[in-house]
């Protein structure tokens, strides 16, 4: 066996390997012993046909094709060792020719990271104040959640809840037909057609109404764009929303911890402030990591992006599946986006995640931010504080190798971000004026 070509570009090595005739012959013997047990040849019991007869029966070309599985993995591994290549992941092997027996391999190499001057990174964290209007909006939402619905003996208004019979066609074909349809009358509603709610306003229970709506040419659903929907609607029941009275009693009913409405508003303020602070912190850290990536030199094998991309797409598909009502709806949504579309859409995110992971990992090792055993044990003690009688059982779970490794990764990430956060919040660096040359100083003094 000999390596006839070797190239290293970035984080990928490429080699071409030619097997000598002795190795090929030994491999064919191994292939024969494997296949002869599976192939029935007339005149011989299974596994008993001589090699020359067997090779004529299945053809030498077929034997060489099968030989790939028998000798290439081992030969590739030996070639990598002989060339002193340190692979980062499984090589991708491809046959070049079978006679002579030549294969090529693309070998991912470990990523390389050279950090920039991260101690010069500066960023500003946003400060968000919660306005009274923001609290009012949340309180209003809570009121609507606790509202009751009562029958109204009047024409339909915006905000009502209706029980109605709907008959309709779309360009003459059946569209939406329901005997008992519940419908919330909202200005912004676009179902079953834009402006449908407006057409219901002022209707009276028991009196049918007919109207038509033309879908806009730029409608999101192409199969509806430009078409005319003709409706016949009979409202059977009109219900109006009754909001509870906003007072101390409402606050206490909502949560016994609250004795006054002011306490409810204060809790809402605190919760909103926490969420806004979390958003500001996330945005702040995104800026820092982006700055660190831009100032650093990063090279990594494509396999890292592919693995991250697969994970992102899998997560997105799981999220999509959990948000739809039926397998049919899930398949319909999938049909609107090909695997290639998804890869193209999420590839930038995968690349960003890989780069982020690499620079932060390099920073952690450079500044020795990986937690020691004492720090990990202390974190486990915090996590099992409320475990009660199951503390020892919980501790044993956290100390399992895989779980403890994940905890170490979490603590490392936390310490690394805290380290770079502290740097970024320092005052801006002042520009340093260059010192004049000593000769220039002397000349100035002589003048």
Swiss-Prot record:
SUPFAM superfamilies: FKBP-like (SSF54534), Triger factor/SurA peptide-binding domain-like (SSF109998), Trigger factor ribosome-binding domain (SSF102735). GO terms for molecular function: peptidyl-prolyl cis-trans isomerase activity; protein folding chaperone; ribosome binding. The keyword Cell cycle applies. Residues 159-244 form the PPIase FKBP-type domain. It comes from the Bacteria. It catalyses: [protein]-peptidylproline (omega=180) = [protein]-peptidylproline (omega=0). GO terms for biological process: 'de novo' cotranslational protein folding; cell division; chaperone-mediated protein folding; protein transport; protein unfolding. Signal peptide: none annotated. It holds the Pfam family Trigger_C. Its main location: cytoplasm. Its EC number is 5.2.1.8. One of its GO terms (cellular component) is cytoplasm. Keywords: Cell cycle, Cell division, Chaperone, Cytoplasm, Isomerase, Rotamase. It is found in: Cytoplasm. Consists of 3 domains; the N-terminus binds the ribosome, the middle domain has PPIase activity, while the C-terminus has intrinsic chaperone activity on its own. Belongs to the FKBP-type PPIase family. Tig subfamily. Involved in protein export. Acts as a chaperone by maintaining the newly synthesized protein in an open conformation. Functions as a peptidyl-prolyl cis-trans isomerase. This is Trigger factor. It comes from Dehalococcoides mccartyi (strain CBDB1).
